[in-house]
């Protein structure tokens, strides 16, 4: 008997996540890879720390242990991709791939063409405490309404959209992520979850730049 490839000893404690084999037969831990689209409500915290109130893991309460690829801050809402496929998470988080993430944003005062231009071309944002001093990468910004706009980012700086707006004298009052790469939030209700499957899942793996573990994911 082995646990995660190591010979087991009498009285050894194991968790549900560990792989247990008797000879060559796996009796626990051969989990099917799962990839989920989650509509995170505002107020839920993206953290794996179970001590934190209203954390996303406890909120989701999914039977398989999953984590997120690309967090949303507590006040933001919308699409999270959550999975137990570590290789997919790592690939999605690699900055060099410039993966697209799209948001709908509401601000506290009327949007101007100058605001749209500056947001599109790049904004200088700073935060001494976070050791942040950067000019944001050019991005696609479109005005939707008097106080709302859409923005497509290919980078993930800390609270980037909020900081960009603040630098231009605006305050974000609502921020919803509606798309990550090819996966769209669509009509998924707040707090709801759906599995990403079939061609949508295949395309996600392709865009993430990995095919590792897809045999398990597509069974």
Kindly give the residue locations of the regions a language model identified.
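Basic, flexible Lys/Arg- and Gly-enriched helix-loop patches that mediate nucleic-acid binding at interfaces
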Residues: 1-219
């Amino acid at each position: 008997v082995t646990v995660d490839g190591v010979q087991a000893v009498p009285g050894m404690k194991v968790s549900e996540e560990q792989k247990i084999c008797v000879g060559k037969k796996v009796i626990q831990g051969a989990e099917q890879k799962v990839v989920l689209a989650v509509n995170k409500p505002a107020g839920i915290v993206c953290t794996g720390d179970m001590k934190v109130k209203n954390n996303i893991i406890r909120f989701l309460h999914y039977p398989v242990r999953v984590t997120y690829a690309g967090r949303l801050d507590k006040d933001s809402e919308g699409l999270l991709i959550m999975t137990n496929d570590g290789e997919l998470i790592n690939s999605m988080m690699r900055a060099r791939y410039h993966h697209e993430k799209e948001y709908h944003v509401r601000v506290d005062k009327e949007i101007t063409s100058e605001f749209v231009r500056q947001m599109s071309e790049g904004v200088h944002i700073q935060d001494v405490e976070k050791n942040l001093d950067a000019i944001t990468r050019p991005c696609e910004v479109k005005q939707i309404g008097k106080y709302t706009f859409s923005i497509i980012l290919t980078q993930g700086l800390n609270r980037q959209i909020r900081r960009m707006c603040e630098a231009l004298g605006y305050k974000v009052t609502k921020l919803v992520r509606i798309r990550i790469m090819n996966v769209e939030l669509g009509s998924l209700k707040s707090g709801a979850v759906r599995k990403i499957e079939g061609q949508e899942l295949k395309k996600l793996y392709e865009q993430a730049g990995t095919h590792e573990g897809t045999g398990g994911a597509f069974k």
